[in-house]
């Protein structure tokens, strides 16, 4: 298990303090703000910079250049754009694919019943898909939340069976 400190809107000195306490993974969802913060992290080479949230296509290049992982790829089109930028930057980036298990229209992500599209993502070069993620519905109903994560587990198991390997965590 990895703890990710979401540091958006927090100043760099707070992030430095958490790093000194042993935290090694930070999450940001604003590319421009993150790039400014990352200038102060040069003395923290072992900090993992994770992009979280919706990645707009006009921010892909800067995101690939600045981050170690992208934790919210919501479409094959965006993944292919990330792949092209990784090729340009001569790097491979870790990816989590976002699955819309709640089926809420305002949320982005691969549809849980479209396994073929999820499997196709593993053919895209320059990216290392390390897992799936979802955003459960905002509700107090624990059963609804549990159902959302159970569906994600089912998608993972079916995709791994189709791939013939346990590639998805």
Question: Could you tell me what each predicted segment is?
Answer:
Residues 1-169:
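Conserved alpha/beta-domain cores
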């Amino acid at each position: 298990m990895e703890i990710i400190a979401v540091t958006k809107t927090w100043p760099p000195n707070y992030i430095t303090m958490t790093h000194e306490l042993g935290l090694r993974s930070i999450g940001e969802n604003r590319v421009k703000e993150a790039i400014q913060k990352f200038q102060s992290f040069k003395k923290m080479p072992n900090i993992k910079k994770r992009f979280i949230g919706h990645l707009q296509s006009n921010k892909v290049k800067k995101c690939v250049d600045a981050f170690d992982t992208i934790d919210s790829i919501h479409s094959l089109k965006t993944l292919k754009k990330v792949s092209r930028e990784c090729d340009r930057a001569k790097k491979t980036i870790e990816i989590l694919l976002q699955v819309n298990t709640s089926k809420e229209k305002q949320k982005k992500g691969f549809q849980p019943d479209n396994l073929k599209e999820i499997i196709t993502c593993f053919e895209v070069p320059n990216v290392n898909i390390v897992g799936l993620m979802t955003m459960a519905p905002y509700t107090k109903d624990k059963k609804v939340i549990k159902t959302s994560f159970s569906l994600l587990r089912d998608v993972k198991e079916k995709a791994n069976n189709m791939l013939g390997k346990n590639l998805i965590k």
